[in-house]
């Protein structure tokens, strides 16, 4: 396409507005009739803050084409409707479009959202794209269309937990051969000071992680690796994404080329320094080269994974040999989508084969939930699933205890409100050294994007305690404004995704999606502030269903009652799901917390 055609295409696209720069309001002045609707009003806008979203002028928040609203007219109408919404009404949003306001009651959700849901036979990208081109549909990803995205921080702790557990499983009894002689596994010579880039007690000191993808989700990888004590190399095909991660301090430095990257890896591994390195290039081209060099005696990674947007072969994965400009032009032309998808799929197969090659060298290799194994399998890589997904490999024991990506946002816009809530979490859980260390690392290393927010994995029995404590802080005036509490859809009981969160369930119920539907119904009945039900997040059309929940702590007694219900029920539904599948840890957790599970004694 020529420049004139590109400009005309953008001018005609109702989802693009070059003049828009959206930021959520701060402070205590209300634009809506209550803090409950004000919270949705601010969080929708926060999702499109240029410091938060990947491509805000296109309404894209993260994850390929994960949008906050269907088009700009819908965005404006949602805000207008929220400003007028009464406390006994609920707004219904269908794939990013406000379609109705109905009389409910004060404890009902103020917003109910359904995004990207298709009847199973039609749940594929071809049907989605046909509807999307007509302006009839929207891809909501997980937290994009449910208005609770907080930037890369939203996934950084989960990625950190994954990397740290991988270190414990694979390397707890053997320090890295790259560490200089005389250095301890903590990266310190006896009697010496410790570099600020060294992480004490890490099983990954002197080791490096190889991955790709620096988008909204993948962008958490370098910082997560650093917090876990590892060196990391993340390949990314777009310089703008590398620049974004450098600017927000998720990435430490960029290598000039593959040789420079390997030299930097060796330098920092030898010193036990946890440093993240970005490399501009195509993973389908660079991973095979790294395999070749490793086989020839070069550096071998200690862990291999990937977070490219392989779930969306049109908008998410650059085919090998293509320029970014060619890729963008093909995305804009529906006639090229079939060819683009085919080329991207072939490249994914090459990418996965390289990951399998690393696994054959004895290197732990794990899928991070972007469906790239499925794409490769469909392309003829019949052993694509030889390496596991990250949930069954490292995370499921946490899910069995109702632990997951609990998050909260300060509607005041004041970072001090977050720091005060950090302190409150430490006070509530004085003996949880893991949570204390996480909060200390987060404050030191994580830059806020948009409204100040915090991610902290908490479990059943902890989430509601935190929510009630925050509500009391608001009531007493210790915080400047109410707190929004939410989570990722990637959580203990809110998702069915056979190639990711529910892969390899003990009872074989990987694809049973009753559970996220029950989760959404339960949170609606409990009085959440807004509830969402999505399809296709993370792994693409046809491969997942998942639910989101958000609840506001506004300091009122009514909020306290809702928080006590919703934050117990939400985590409890995850424990229920895993107990039903036969996980003893979940059964024990259910009994400790007094859950009533009729079929489990």
Curated annotation (Swiss-Prot):
NAD(+) binds at residues 63-64, 141, 216-218, 236, 282-283, 307-311, 317-318, 368, 538. Its EC number is 4.2.1.49. It is found in: Cytoplasm. Its main location: cytoplasm. Binds 1 NAD(+) per subunit. InterPro entries: Urocanase (IPR055351), Urocanase-like (IPR023637), Urocanase_C (IPR035401), Urocanase_central_sf (IPR038364), Urocanase_CS (IPR023636), Urocanase_N (IPR035400), Urocanase_Rossmann-like (IPR035085), Urocanase_sf (IPR036190). GO terms for molecular function: urocanate hydratase activity. Belongs to the urocanase family. Catalyzes the conversion of urocanate to 4-imidazolone-5-propionate. This is Urocanate hydratase. It comes from Ralstonia nicotianae (strain ATCC BAA-1114 / GMI1000).
């Amino acid at each position: 396409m020529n420049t004139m055609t590109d400009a005309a295409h953008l001018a005609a696209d109702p989802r693009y507005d070059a003049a828009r720069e959206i930021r959520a309001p701060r402070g205590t002045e209300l634009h809506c009739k209550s803090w409950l609707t004000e919270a949705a009003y601010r969080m929708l806008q926060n999702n499109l803050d240029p410091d938060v979203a990947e491509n805000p002028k296109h309404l894209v928040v993260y994850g390929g084409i994960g949008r906050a609203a269907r088009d700009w007219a819908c965005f404006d109408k949602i805000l207008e409707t929220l400003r007028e919404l009464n406390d006994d009404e609920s707004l219904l949003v269908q794939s990013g479009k406000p379609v109705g306001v109905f009389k409910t009651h004060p404890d009902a959700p103020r917003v109910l959202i359904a995004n990207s849901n298709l009847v199973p036979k039609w749940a594929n990208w071809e049907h989605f794209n046909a509807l999307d081109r007509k302006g009839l549909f929207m891809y909501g990803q997980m937290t994009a269309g449910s208005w609770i995205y907080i930037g890369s921080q939203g996934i950084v702790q989960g990625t950190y937990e994954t990397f740290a557990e991988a270190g414990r499983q694979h390397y707890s009894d053997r320090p890295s051969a790259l560490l200089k002689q005389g250095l301890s596994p903590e990266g310190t010579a006896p009697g010496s000071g410790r570099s600020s880039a060294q992480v004490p007690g890490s099983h990954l000191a002197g080791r490096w992680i190889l991955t790709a993808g620096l988008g909204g989700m993948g962008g958490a990888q370098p910082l997560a690796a650093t917090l876990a004590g590892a060196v990391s190399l993340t390949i990314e095909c777009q310089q703008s994404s590398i620049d974004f991660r450098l600017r927000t301090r998720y990435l430490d430095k960029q290598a000039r080329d593959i040789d420079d990257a390997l030299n930097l890896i060796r330098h920092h591994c030898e010193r036990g320094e946890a440093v993240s390195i970005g490399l501009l290039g195509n993973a389908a081209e660079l991973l095979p080269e790294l395999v070749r060099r490793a086989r020839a005696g070069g550096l071998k990674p200690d862990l291999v994974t990937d977070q490219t947007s392989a779930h969306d072969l049109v908008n998410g994965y650059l085919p090998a040999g293509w320029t970014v400009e060619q890729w963008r032009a093909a995305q804009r032309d529906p006639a090229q989508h079939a060819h683009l998808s085919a080329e991207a799929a072939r490249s994914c197969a090459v990418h996965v084969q390289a990951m399998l090659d690393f696994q054959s060298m004895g290197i732990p290799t794990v899928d991070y939930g972007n469906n790239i194994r499925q794409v490769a399998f469909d392309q003829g890589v019949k052993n694509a699933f030889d390496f596991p997904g990250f949930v069954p490999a490292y995370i499921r024991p946490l899910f069995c205890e109702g632990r997951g990506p609990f998050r909260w946002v300060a509607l005041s816009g004041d970072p001090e409100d977050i720091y005060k809530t950090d302190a409150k979490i430490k006070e509530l859980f004085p003996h949880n050294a893991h949570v204390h260390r996480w909060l200390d690392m987060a404050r030191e290393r994580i830059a806020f994007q948009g409204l100040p927010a915090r991610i902290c994995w908490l479990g059943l029995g902890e989430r509601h305690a935190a929510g009630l404590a925050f509500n009391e802080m608001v009531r007493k005036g210790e915080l400047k404004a109410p707190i929004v509490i939410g989570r990722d859809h990637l959580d203990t009981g809110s998702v069915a995704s056979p190639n990711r969160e529910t892969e390899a369930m003990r009872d074989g119920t990987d694809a049973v999606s009753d559970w996220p539907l029950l989760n959404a119904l339960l949170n609606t009945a409990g009085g959440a502030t807004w509830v969402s039900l999505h399809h296709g997040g993370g792994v693409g059309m046809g491969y997942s269903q998942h639910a989101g929940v958000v609840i506001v702590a506004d300091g009122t007694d009514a909020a306290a009652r809702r928080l006590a219900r919703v934050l117990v029920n939400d985590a409890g539904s995850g424990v229920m799901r895993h107990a039903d599948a036969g996980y003893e840890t979940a059964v024990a957790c259910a009994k400790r917390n007094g859950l009533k599970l009729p079929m489990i004694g």
